[in-house]
From Swiss-Prot:
Any one Gene Ontology BP term: regulation of nitrogen utilization
GO MF assignments: ATP binding; enzyme regulator activity
InterPro entries for the chain: N-reg_PII, N-reg_PII-like_a/b, N-reg_PII/ATP_PRibTrfase_C, N-reg_PII_CS, N-reg_PII_urydylation_site
Protein's UniProt name: Nitrogen regulatory protein P-II
Keywords: Nitrogen fixation, Nucleotide-binding, Phosphoprotein, Transcription, Transcription regulation
O-UMP-tyrosine sites (modified residues): 51
Gene transcribed to yield this protein: glnB
Protein's job: In nitrogen-limiting conditions, when the ratio of Gln to 2-ketoglutarate decreases, P-II is uridylylated to P-II-UMP. P-II-UMP allows the deadenylation of glutamine synthetase (GS), thus activating the enzyme. Conversely, in nitrogen excess P-II is deuridylated and promotes the adenylation of GS. P-II indirectly controls the transcription of the GS gene (glnA). P-II prevents NR-II-catalyzed conversion of NR-I to NR-I-phosphate, the transcriptional activator of glnA. When P-II is uridylylated to P-II-UMP, these events are reversed.
Gene Ontology CC annotations of this record: cytosol
UniProt subunit comment: Homotrimer.
Cross-referenced PROSITE patterns: PII_GLNB_CTER, PII_GLNB_DOM, PII_GLNB_UMP
Taxonomic source organism: Azospirillum brasilense
The family this protein is said to belong to: Belongs to the P(II) protein family.
Protein backbone atom coordinates (compact mmCIF):
# COMPACT_ATOMS: atom_id res chain seq x y z
CA UNK A 1 0.00 0.00 0.00
CA UNK A 2 1.04 3.58 -0.64
CA UNK A 3 -0.01 7.00 0.55
CA UNK A 4 -0.17 9.86 -1.92
CA UNK A 5 -0.06 13.40 -0.59
CA UNK A 6 -0.69 16.10 -3.15
CA UNK A 7 -0.42 19.83 -2.56
CA UNK A 8 -2.50 21.64 -5.18
CA UNK A 9 -4.16 24.98 -5.92
CA UNK A 10 -7.55 25.19 -4.16
CA UNK A 11 -9.56 25.86 -7.31
CA UNK A 12 -8.32 22.55 -8.78
CA UNK A 13 -9.76 20.41 -5.96
CA UNK A 14 -13.01 19.44 -7.70
CA UNK A 15 -11.19 18.42 -10.88
CA UNK A 16 -8.66 16.32 -8.94
CA UNK A 17 -11.39 14.69 -6.84
CA UNK A 18 -13.31 13.71 -9.99
CA UNK A 19 -10.16 12.43 -11.71
CA UNK A 20 -9.31 10.23 -8.71
CA UNK A 21 -12.86 8.88 -8.60
CA UNK A 22 -12.56 7.92 -12.28
CA UNK A 23 -9.47 5.77 -11.60
CA UNK A 24 -11.16 3.93 -8.74
CA UNK A 25 -10.21 5.92 -5.64
CA UNK A 26 -13.13 5.75 -3.22
CA UNK A 27 -12.12 8.21 -0.52
CA UNK A 28 -9.77 11.12 0.09
CA UNK A 29 -8.84 13.41 2.97
CA UNK A 30 -8.59 17.12 2.22
CA UNK A 31 -6.89 19.74 4.40
CA UNK A 32 -6.60 23.46 3.80
CA UNK A 33 -2.94 24.45 3.87
CA UNK A 34 -0.65 27.41 3.29
CA UNK A 35 2.84 27.32 1.88
CA UNK A 36 5.28 28.49 -0.73
CA UNK A 37 7.86 26.99 -3.01
CA UNK A 38 9.87 28.55 -5.77
CA UNK A 39 7.26 31.27 -6.33
CA UNK A 40 8.01 32.69 -2.83
CA UNK A 41 4.64 34.43 -2.43
CA UNK A 42 3.69 37.88 -3.67
CA UNK A 43 3.12 41.48 -2.57
CA UNK A 44 -0.28 43.07 -1.95
CA UNK A 45 -1.34 46.65 -1.43
CA UNK A 46 -3.58 47.31 1.60
CA UNK A 47 -4.60 50.82 2.64
CA UNK A 48 -1.67 52.32 0.80
CA UNK A 49 0.95 50.02 2.33
CA UNK A 50 2.68 47.16 0.56
CA UNK A 51 2.73 43.77 2.30
CA UNK A 52 4.58 40.60 1.39
CA UNK A 53 2.31 37.56 1.47
CA UNK A 54 4.71 34.67 2.05
CA UNK A 55 2.24 31.83 2.37
CA UNK A 56 -0.17 31.06 -0.44
CA UNK A 57 -3.41 29.10 0.03
CA UNK A 58 -3.13 25.46 -1.00
CA UNK A 59 -5.09 22.25 -0.53
CA UNK A 60 -3.48 19.03 0.69
CA UNK A 61 -5.05 15.78 -0.50
CA UNK A 62 -4.18 12.49 1.18
CA UNK A 63 -5.10 9.12 -0.31
CA UNK A 64 -4.07 5.59 0.69
CA UNK A 65 -4.35 2.92 -1.99
CA UNK A 66 -3.15 -0.44 -3.21
CA UNK A 67 0.14 -0.32 -5.13
CA UNK A 68 -1.66 -1.21 -8.37
CA UNK A 69 -3.49 2.15 -8.42
CA UNK A 70 -0.55 4.43 -7.66
CA UNK A 71 0.65 5.25 -11.18
CA UNK A 72 -2.88 5.91 -12.45
CA UNK A 73 -3.62 8.10 -9.41
CA UNK A 74 -0.44 10.14 -9.92
CA UNK A 75 -1.26 10.63 -13.58
CA UNK A 76 -4.85 11.65 -12.74
CA UNK A 77 -3.68 14.22 -10.18
CA UNK A 78 -1.03 15.62 -12.54
CA UNK A 79 -3.47 16.06 -15.40
CA UNK A 80 -6.28 17.51 -13.28
CA UNK A 81 -4.12 19.89 -11.20
CA UNK A 82 -1.94 21.14 -14.07
CA UNK A 83 -2.22 24.79 -15.13
CA UNK A 84 1.32 25.18 -16.47
CA UNK A 85 2.01 28.01 -14.06
CA UNK A 86 4.29 28.23 -11.04
CA UNK A 87 2.64 26.87 -7.91
CA UNK A 88 0.76 23.94 -9.47
CA UNK A 89 1.95 21.83 -6.54
CA UNK A 90 3.73 18.62 -5.66
CA UNK A 91 2.90 14.93 -5.27
CA UNK A 92 4.57 12.80 -2.59
CA UNK A 93 4.34 9.00 -2.46
CA UNK A 94 5.24 7.06 0.69
CA UNK A 95 4.84 3.42 1.75
CA UNK A 96 2.11 2.50 4.23
CA UNK A 97 2.82 -0.45 6.52
CA UNK A 98 -0.70 -1.02 7.83
CA UNK A 99 -4.24 0.33 7.70
CA UNK A 100 -6.90 -0.48 10.30
CA UNK A 101 -10.56 0.50 10.00
CA UNK A 102 -11.50 1.59 13.52
CA UNK A 103 -15.19 0.64 13.28
CA UNK A 104 -14.72 -2.98 12.13
CA UNK A 105 -11.10 -3.82 12.86
CA UNK A 106 -10.50 -4.70 9.19
CA UNK A 107 -6.85 -4.47 8.18
CA UNK A 108 -4.79 -3.94 5.04
CA UNK A 109 -6.50 -3.46 1.69
CA UNK A 110 -9.90 -4.32 3.16
CA UNK A 111 -9.64 -1.28 5.44
CA UNK A 112 -9.00 1.23 2.66
Amino acid sequence: MKKIEAIIKPFKLDEVKEALHEVGIKGITVTEAKGFGRQKGHTELYRGAEYVVDFLPKVKIEVVMEDSLVERAIEAIQQAAHTGRIGDGKIFVTPVEEVVRIRTGEKGGDAI
